[in-house]
Amino acid sequence: MSTNSPLSRARFHAATIVAVLTCSTGSLAARQVREDGLRVLDDTTIVQQVELLDGTKLFGRIARIDSTQILFRTVGGLEIGFQRRDVNQVRVVRGQRYRGEFWPADPSDSRLFLAPTARVPGQGHGYAGVYELVVPSFGVGIGKMGMISGGFSAIPGIDLEDQLFYIAPKLQLLSSEYVQGAVGLFWVKPGTSEESVGMVYTGITAGDFRASFSGGISFPFGSRSGFSEDPLLMLGGEVRTSKDVKFITENWIVPGEGTAILSFGFRRIDSRLTVEAAVATSTKGGGFLPLVNFSIAW
Protein backbone atom coordinates (compact mmCIF):
# COMPACT_ATOMS: atom_id res chain seq x y z
CA MET A 1 0.00 0.00 0.00
CA SER A 2 1.36 3.42 -0.92
CA THR A 3 1.95 5.89 1.93
CA ASN A 4 2.59 8.93 -0.28
CA SER A 5 -0.73 10.71 0.23
CA PRO A 6 -1.49 12.55 3.50
CA LEU A 7 -4.48 10.27 4.15
CA SER A 8 -2.41 7.13 3.61
CA ARG A 9 0.35 8.47 5.85
CA ALA A 10 -2.25 9.27 8.53
CA ARG A 11 -3.57 5.72 8.37
CA PHE A 12 -0.03 4.30 8.45
CA HIS A 13 0.86 6.40 11.50
CA ALA A 14 -2.38 5.41 13.22
CA ALA A 15 -1.73 1.71 12.57
CA THR A 16 1.77 2.05 14.01
CA ILE A 17 0.40 3.75 17.13
CA VAL A 18 -2.25 1.03 17.52
CA ALA A 19 0.40 -1.67 17.36
CA VAL A 20 2.61 0.04 19.93
CA LEU A 21 -0.28 0.63 22.33
CA THR A 22 -1.53 -2.93 21.95
CA CYS A 23 1.89 -4.40 22.65
CA SER A 24 2.44 -2.08 25.62
CA THR A 25 -0.90 -2.76 27.26
CA GLY A 26 -0.60 -6.44 26.43
CA SER A 27 2.57 -6.61 28.53
CA LEU A 28 0.75 -4.78 31.33
CA ALA A 29 -2.05 -7.32 31.17
CA ALA A 30 0.44 -10.18 31.25
CA ARG A 31 2.02 -8.77 34.40
CA GLN A 32 -1.46 -8.41 35.91
CA VAL A 33 -2.31 -12.04 35.13
CA ARG A 34 0.88 -13.22 36.80
CA GLU A 35 0.12 -11.05 39.82
CA ASP A 36 -3.53 -12.02 40.23
CA GLY A 37 -3.08 -15.51 38.85
CA LEU A 38 -5.31 -18.42 39.55
CA ARG A 39 -5.97 -17.84 43.20
CA VAL A 40 -8.71 -16.94 45.64
CA LEU A 41 -8.53 -13.24 46.53
CA ASP A 42 -9.11 -12.06 50.09
CA ASP A 43 -10.98 -8.89 49.07
CA THR A 44 -14.58 -9.95 48.45
CA THR A 45 -15.39 -6.70 46.59
CA ILE A 46 -13.02 -7.54 43.72
CA VAL A 47 -14.43 -8.97 40.48
CA GLN A 48 -12.29 -11.36 38.46
CA GLN A 49 -12.64 -12.06 34.77
CA VAL A 50 -11.71 -15.58 33.73
CA GLU A 51 -11.23 -16.16 30.01
CA LEU A 52 -11.22 -19.79 28.90
CA LEU A 53 -9.33 -21.18 25.94
CA ASP A 54 -12.55 -21.34 23.89
CA GLY A 55 -13.07 -17.57 24.35
CA THR A 56 -15.74 -17.79 27.06
CA LYS A 57 -15.54 -14.93 29.57
CA LEU A 58 -16.85 -15.30 33.11
CA PHE A 59 -17.22 -12.50 35.66
CA GLY A 60 -17.23 -13.18 39.38
CA ARG A 61 -14.74 -14.73 41.79
CA ILE A 62 -12.66 -17.87 42.07
CA ALA A 63 -14.24 -19.62 45.05
CA ARG A 64 -11.98 -22.65 45.30
CA ILE A 65 -8.95 -23.98 43.48
CA ASP A 66 -6.71 -27.02 43.64
CA SER A 67 -4.02 -28.49 41.42
CA THR A 68 -6.45 -29.45 38.64
CA GLN A 69 -9.92 -27.98 39.29
CA ILE A 70 -11.40 -24.49 39.71
CA LEU A 71 -14.76 -23.59 41.22
CA PHE A 72 -15.91 -20.18 39.97
CA ARG A 73 -18.85 -18.21 41.39
CA THR A 74 -20.33 -15.72 38.90
CA VAL A 75 -21.69 -12.29 39.85
CA GLY A 76 -25.15 -13.83 39.54
CA GLY A 77 -24.33 -16.50 42.13
CA LEU A 78 -23.99 -19.44 39.72
CA GLU A 79 -21.15 -21.85 40.56
CA ILE A 80 -19.24 -23.30 37.60
CA GLY A 81 -16.47 -25.88 37.71
CA PHE A 82 -13.81 -26.31 35.03
CA GLN A 83 -10.31 -27.62 34.52
CA ARG A 84 -7.38 -25.43 35.46
CA ARG A 85 -5.72 -26.21 32.14
CA ASP A 86 -8.72 -24.70 30.29
CA VAL A 87 -7.99 -21.18 31.60
CA ASN A 88 -6.40 -18.72 29.18
CA GLN A 89 -6.10 -15.75 31.55
CA VAL A 90 -7.42 -14.25 34.77
CA ARG A 91 -7.49 -10.56 35.62
CA VAL A 92 -9.21 -8.14 37.94
CA VAL A 93 -11.84 -5.89 36.33
CA ARG A 94 -13.86 -2.92 37.54
CA GLY A 95 -17.62 -2.80 37.23
CA GLN A 96 -20.78 -4.01 38.90
CA ARG A 97 -23.77 -6.27 38.55
CA TYR A 98 -26.75 -4.68 36.83
CA ARG A 99 -29.86 -6.24 35.29
CA GLY A 100 -28.57 -9.70 36.15
CA GLU A 101 -25.22 -9.39 34.38
CA PHE A 102 -21.81 -7.80 34.84
CA TRP A 103 -21.40 -4.31 33.37
CA PRO A 104 -17.73 -3.31 33.06
CA ALA A 105 -16.81 0.15 34.28
CA ASP A 106 -16.07 2.71 31.58
CA PRO A 107 -12.25 3.02 31.64
CA SER A 108 -12.51 6.40 29.87
CA ASP A 109 -15.04 8.06 32.20
CA SER A 110 -12.53 10.81 33.11
CA ARG A 111 -13.50 12.50 29.82
CA LEU A 112 -16.33 12.81 27.32
CA PHE A 113 -14.97 12.92 23.75
CA LEU A 114 -12.36 15.60 24.42
CA ALA A 115 -13.64 17.55 27.41
CA PRO A 116 -12.79 16.38 30.93
CA THR A 117 -15.38 15.19 33.39
CA ALA A 118 -14.85 15.67 37.14
CA ARG A 119 -13.86 12.01 37.52
CA VAL A 120 -10.30 10.68 37.84
CA PRO A 121 -9.05 7.15 37.07
CA GLY A 122 -7.49 6.53 40.49
CA GLN A 123 -4.00 5.58 41.59
CA GLY A 124 -2.41 2.96 39.37
CA HIS A 125 -4.94 3.37 36.57
CA GLY A 126 -4.65 5.24 33.30
CA TYR A 127 -5.04 5.05 29.54
CA ALA A 128 -3.23 5.57 26.26
CA GLY A 129 -5.00 6.29 23.03
CA VAL A 130 -5.37 8.31 19.86
CA TYR A 131 -7.75 11.18 19.06
CA GLU A 132 -8.82 11.65 15.45
CA LEU A 133 -6.16 9.11 14.35
CA VAL A 134 -3.39 11.74 14.57
CA VAL A 135 -3.21 12.85 18.23
CA PRO A 136 -1.66 10.22 20.52
CA SER A 137 -2.62 10.86 24.15
CA PHE A 138 -2.30 9.46 27.65
CA GLY A 139 -3.80 9.92 31.11
CA VAL A 140 -2.52 8.66 34.46
CA GLY A 141 -4.13 8.76 37.89
CA ILE A 142 -2.10 10.42 40.65
CA GLY A 143 -3.22 9.37 44.10
CA LYS A 144 -6.95 9.15 44.71
CA MET A 145 -7.91 12.64 43.53
CA GLY A 146 -5.52 13.71 40.80
CA MET A 147 -4.52 12.89 37.26
CA ILE A 148 -2.33 14.22 34.50
CA SER A 149 -2.94 13.76 30.81
CA GLY A 150 -1.19 14.95 27.71
CA GLY A 151 -0.44 14.27 24.10
CA PHE A 152 0.91 15.59 20.83
CA SER A 153 -0.16 15.84 17.22
CA ALA A 154 1.33 13.58 14.56
CA ILE A 155 -0.18 15.12 11.45
CA PRO A 156 1.42 13.76 8.26
CA GLY A 157 3.11 16.36 6.09
CA ILE A 158 3.84 18.72 9.00
CA ASP A 159 7.37 19.01 10.35
CA LEU A 160 7.99 17.77 13.88
CA GLU A 161 8.87 21.23 15.14
CA ASP A 162 5.49 22.52 13.93
CA GLN A 163 3.37 19.88 15.68
CA LEU A 164 1.33 20.68 18.80
CA PHE A 165 1.72 19.17 22.22
CA TYR A 166 -0.40 19.62 25.31
CA ILE A 167 -0.56 18.80 28.99
CA ALA A 168 -3.66 18.75 31.21
CA PRO A 169 -3.45 18.22 34.98
CA LYS A 170 -6.69 17.79 36.95
CA LEU A 171 -7.43 17.80 40.68
CA GLN A 172 -10.66 16.40 42.09
CA LEU A 173 -11.90 18.56 45.00
CA LEU A 174 -15.21 16.79 45.63
CA SER A 175 -15.81 13.06 45.51
CA SER A 176 -19.03 11.36 46.58
CA GLU A 177 -21.03 8.46 45.23
CA TYR A 178 -23.09 10.58 42.84
CA VAL A 179 -21.34 13.98 42.57
CA GLN A 180 -17.75 14.91 41.76
CA GLY A 181 -16.12 18.31 41.35
CA ALA A 182 -12.73 19.20 39.88
CA VAL A 183 -10.45 21.98 38.69
CA GLY A 184 -7.86 21.71 35.99
CA LEU A 185 -5.63 23.24 33.35
CA PHE A 186 -5.35 22.59 29.62
CA TRP A 187 -2.10 23.99 28.15
CA VAL A 188 -1.10 23.80 24.48
CA LYS A 189 2.27 24.66 22.94
CA PRO A 190 2.28 25.06 19.13
CA GLY A 191 5.64 23.55 18.21
CA THR A 192 8.54 25.99 18.22
CA SER A 193 6.28 29.03 18.67
CA GLU A 194 7.12 31.19 21.66
CA GLU A 195 3.43 31.65 22.41
CA SER A 196 1.24 29.09 24.17
CA VAL A 197 -2.49 28.97 24.79
CA GLY A 198 -4.78 27.14 27.15
CA MET A 199 -7.57 27.39 29.65
CA VAL A 200 -8.24 26.85 33.32
CA TYR A 201 -11.54 25.27 34.24
CA THR A 202 -13.78 24.05 36.99
CA GLY A 203 -16.51 21.49 36.54
CA ILE A 204 -18.88 19.00 38.11
CA THR A 205 -20.17 15.56 37.19
CA ALA A 206 -23.42 14.24 38.66
CA GLY A 207 -24.87 10.77 38.20
CA ASP A 208 -23.79 7.14 38.25
CA PHE A 209 -22.48 4.55 35.80
CA ARG A 210 -25.85 4.43 34.00
CA ALA A 211 -26.29 8.16 33.27
CA SER A 212 -24.52 11.36 34.24
CA PHE A 213 -24.32 15.07 33.49
CA SER A 214 -21.10 17.08 33.27
CA GLY A 215 -20.85 20.85 33.18
CA GLY A 216 -18.08 23.36 33.56
CA ILE A 217 -16.80 26.84 32.90
CA SER A 218 -13.42 27.51 31.29
CA PHE A 219 -11.32 30.65 31.07
CA PRO A 220 -9.15 30.72 27.92
CA PHE A 221 -5.78 32.46 27.98
CA GLY A 222 -2.75 33.16 25.83
CA SER A 223 0.79 33.62 27.06
CA ARG A 224 0.89 37.02 25.36
CA SER A 225 -2.74 38.13 25.34
CA GLY A 226 -3.66 37.04 28.87
CA PHE A 227 -7.12 35.81 29.82
CA SER A 228 -10.04 36.23 27.43
CA GLU A 229 -13.06 38.27 28.52
CA ASP A 230 -15.37 35.54 27.19
CA PRO A 231 -15.47 32.30 29.21
CA LEU A 232 -16.52 29.02 27.63
CA LEU A 233 -19.29 26.81 28.95
CA MET A 234 -19.22 23.05 28.51
CA LEU A 235 -22.38 21.00 28.91
CA GLY A 236 -22.35 17.27 28.32
CA GLY A 237 -23.90 14.00 29.28
CA GLU A 238 -23.58 10.23 29.11
CA VAL A 239 -26.25 7.52 28.99
CA ARG A 240 -25.41 3.83 29.10
CA THR A 241 -27.65 2.19 26.49
CA SER A 242 -26.30 -1.31 27.16
CA LYS A 243 -23.49 -2.96 29.09
CA ASP A 244 -20.99 -2.13 26.35
CA VAL A 245 -22.40 0.99 24.61
CA LYS A 246 -22.73 4.55 25.90
CA PHE A 247 -24.31 7.58 24.21
CA ILE A 248 -22.31 10.78 24.77
CA THR A 249 -22.90 14.42 23.97
CA GLU A 250 -20.35 17.21 24.46
CA ASN A 251 -21.20 20.85 23.74
CA TRP A 252 -19.06 23.99 23.98
CA ILE A 253 -20.86 27.33 24.22
CA VAL A 254 -19.50 30.89 23.91
CA PRO A 255 -22.13 32.99 25.74
CA GLY A 256 -20.73 36.33 24.59
CA GLU A 257 -20.99 35.36 20.93
CA GLY A 258 -24.08 33.16 21.02
CA THR A 259 -22.31 30.32 19.21
CA ALA A 260 -21.78 26.71 20.14
CA ILE A 261 -19.98 23.59 18.97
CA LEU A 262 -22.19 20.54 19.40
CA SER A 263 -21.16 16.89 19.27
CA PHE A 264 -22.83 13.56 19.87
CA GLY A 265 -22.03 9.92 19.28
CA PHE A 266 -21.31 6.58 20.91
CA ARG A 267 -18.57 4.88 22.90
CA ARG A 268 -18.02 1.12 22.69
CA ILE A 269 -16.86 -0.14 26.09
CA ASP A 270 -14.77 -3.13 27.02
CA SER A 271 -13.03 -3.67 30.36
CA ARG A 272 -9.89 -2.07 28.86
CA LEU A 273 -10.67 -0.84 25.35
CA THR A 274 -12.95 2.02 24.32
CA VAL A 275 -13.74 3.13 20.78
CA GLU A 276 -15.69 6.30 19.98
CA ALA A 277 -17.47 7.45 16.85
CA ALA A 278 -19.21 10.82 16.79
CA VAL A 279 -19.91 13.94 14.75
CA ALA A 280 -19.44 17.60 15.64
CA THR A 281 -21.03 20.70 14.15
CA SER A 282 -21.27 24.43 14.79
CA THR A 283 -24.43 26.46 15.25
CA LYS A 284 -22.99 28.77 12.58
CA GLY A 285 -23.08 25.95 10.04
CA GLY A 286 -20.23 24.43 8.14
CA GLY A 287 -21.36 20.82 8.03
CA PHE A 288 -20.34 17.92 10.24
CA LEU A 289 -16.89 16.83 11.36
CA PRO A 290 -16.43 13.12 12.15
CA LEU A 291 -14.73 12.23 15.43
CA VAL A 292 -12.96 8.90 15.89
CA ASN A 293 -11.10 8.10 19.12
CA PHE A 294 -9.91 4.99 20.87
CA SER A 295 -7.99 4.21 24.04
CA ILE A 296 -6.66 1.25 25.98
CA ALA A 297 -6.74 1.39 29.78
CA TRP A 298 -4.82 -0.34 32.54
Task: Give residue spans per PLM region.
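Bacterial N-terminal signal peptides
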Residues: 14-25
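Structural signature of outer-membrane beta-barrel domains
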Residues: 155-157, 188-190, 220-222, 254-256, ...
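Bacterial N-terminal signal peptides that target proteins for export
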Residues: 2-15
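Short, conserved beta-strand edge motifs with alternating hydrophobic and charged residues
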Residues: 213-218, 248-250
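Compositionally biased alpha-helical segments
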Residues: 30-137
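Feature captures outer-membrane beta-barrel proteins of Gram-negative bacteria and organelles
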Residues: 134-155, 163-176, 183, 198-215, ...
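Short, glycine/charged-rich beta-strand-loop motifs at protein surfaces that mediate ligand recognition
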Residues: 248-255, 263
